[in-house]
Amino acid sequence: MAADMQRKRSSECPEGTLAPSNGQSVERAESPTPGLTQGTEPGAGQEGAMFVHTRSYEDLTELEDREASGDSPKECVGSPPPLATDMRQISQDFSELSTQLTGVARDLQEEMLPGSSEDWPEPQGAAGRGAATEPSQEGSTEGEEEDATEAWRLHQKHVFVLSEAGKPVYSRYGSEEALSSTMGVMVALVSFLEADKNAIRSIHADGYKVVFVRRSPLVLVAVARTRQSAQELAQELLYIYYQILSLLTGAQLSHIFQQKQNYDLRRLLSGSERITDNLLQLMARDPSFLMGAARCLPLAAAVRDTVSASLQQARARSLVFSILLAHNQLVALVRRKDQFLHPIDLHLLFNLISSSSSFREGEAWTPVCLPKFNAAGFFHAHISYLEPDTDLCLLLISTDREDFFAVSDCRRRFQERLRKRGTHLALREALRTPYYSVAQVGIPDLRHFLYKSKSSGLFTSPEIEAPYSSEEEQERLLGLYQYLHSRAHNASRPLKTIYYTGPNENLLAWVTGAFELYMCYSPLGTKASAVSAIHKLMRWIRKEEDRLFILTPLTY
């Protein structure tokens, strides 16, 4: 079991719990102060946690560095649910997942037979996927011409994934074949430095950052000229790595390259590129990834409590997590006692659902790996939309691949309870306005904000409105947040407060041990008015917290 599952008992795991260290309840502060303790801030859960608790952004990257070096951190873990980790079973599950996502069943056992690689046609690259130019005329080398264009070079960010043997696996823009020589240089550079017992992490030159993340047997590289720090780019690369694990499992990935070091992984991942593409698009515009947290659908507390209780009652023995979501926002989450979901795994589930419209066609039963929870094997996920014309999607995560009918019955019982209580009508009404307006806060110059409760792992933000209505402006705003975030979480010199003035807007960041707050407001505003607005905003969040957060998470 991955080391990301933690017990609630603070006496055993003081930095992995959301409860006060003495085990007693703490009075919630009415107004925020720099000394506000974790667990008392607006949005803090009162009945424990839903997610693996990461104290801060730095914890995520520190943990990854430890895992990469083989130095396992001391963490508290719950009793892992049983998962099939036999390679035959994993191979069968992968074949089912491949069929679900791409329409083509792929047999790992056949892939590993001697000489099988020669029998396969060369995988098609990503030419045209995200390309900036028109397809070339017949007879030309399409990928080479495309990748040589100035338009290709003008992309703000490129992402490459390759094997340690230098085989291309994925490229964000253009064709992997045309970029194979570039990827070969990248892996040669990594290998050259490692021969001297050094590790390359990033290169900074001419406004570009080149960031390397090595997770054997893969090497991931980002080339960017954005406001993101090298640390944040590395975190995005880790999301790509975990996305690959969610499709293959860590056990299968290791097994493949133990058998064939120069294996072309695109054979197994062919057809799933759109899932990785979608993940990169989400990371470019959804602040959930930047905040390392989940956002809740604004919902009356009584309605959310009824939904959570209905999920809790409609359970099967094999269920580990029951999740209801809409518009990439949480409606409710119920978990097995002592089992905690990692925000990264939840984001990957969101990405899986938003990447495929096939889940709307009926009840899907598909293998899925939650790599931060357990990278060794597949869970089985029952995925369905409650009604064809709504965005309410129900995920029921089970440990038993043969338990489809029992889990499907959980869905039926859950829907019956919602209808009996009239809750389905309240959910429909909430979906009519899945985001709230910043005007509700009542601060004239405030344009947008991000607020994260560190103890609950949840954040809230209003709808992005004018003057950020276009996709370009929304990405620019997120880029400003990324800049503030990178300054606040700088590994060598982190900042607690940042005041940024620009030609189009002013921004303020405030990071404490209990929460993170990023505010964007009119360029006509002053620093004094921004500081004054913090207290008004925090009081508003406190007032609305039972609508914006899940304060009483339930367990089986």
From Swiss-Prot:
User: Do the record's keywords include Iron?
Assistant: no
Which residues carry the post-translational modification Phosphothreonine, per the record?
Answer: T61
Q: Name one GO biological process term.
A: protein secretion
Region feature Disordered, mapped onto this chain: 1-88, 113-149
On this chain, the residues bearing Phosphoserine are S31, S56, S79, S91
Family matches, as InterPro entries = FUZ/MON1/HPS1_longin_1, FUZ/MON1/HPS1_longin_2, FUZ/MON1/HPS1_longin_3, Mon1
Q: In which tissues is it expressed?
A: Widely expressed (at protein level).
Can you tell me which residues the record assigns to a coiled coil? none
A GO cellular component term found in this entry reads: Mon1-Ccz1 complex
Entry's Gene Ontology molecular function annotations = guanyl-nucleotide exchange factor activity
Q: Where is the composition biased (Basic and acidic residues)?
A: 1-12
**Keywords assigned by UniProt, alphabetized:** Guanine-nucleotide releasing factor, Phosphoprotein
Q: Which family does it belong to?
A: Belongs to the MON1/SAND family.
Assembly behavior = Interacts with CCZ1. Found in a complex with RMC1, CCZ1, MON1A and MON1B. The MON1A-CCZ1B complex interacts with RIMOC1. The MON1A-CCZ1B complex interacts with RAB7A and this interaction is enhanced in the presence of RIMOC1.
Which PANTHER family does this UniProt record tie to the protein?
SAND PROTEIN-RELATED (PTHR13027), VACUOLAR FUSION PROTEIN MON1 HOMOLOG A (PTHR13027:SF14)
Q: What does this protein do?
A: Plays an important role in membrane trafficking through the secretory apparatus. Not involved in endocytic trafficking to lysosomes. Acts in concert with CCZ1, as a guanine exchange factor (GEF) for RAB7, promotes the exchange of GDP to GTP, converting it from an inactive GDP-bound form into an active GTP-bound form.
Q: In its UniProt entry, what is this protein called? A: Vacuolar fusion protein MON1 homolog A
Origin species, per record, is: Mus musculus
Q: What lineage does UniProt assign to this protein's organism?
A: Eukaryota, Metazoa, Chordata, Craniata, Vertebrata
Q: Coding gene?
A: Mon1a
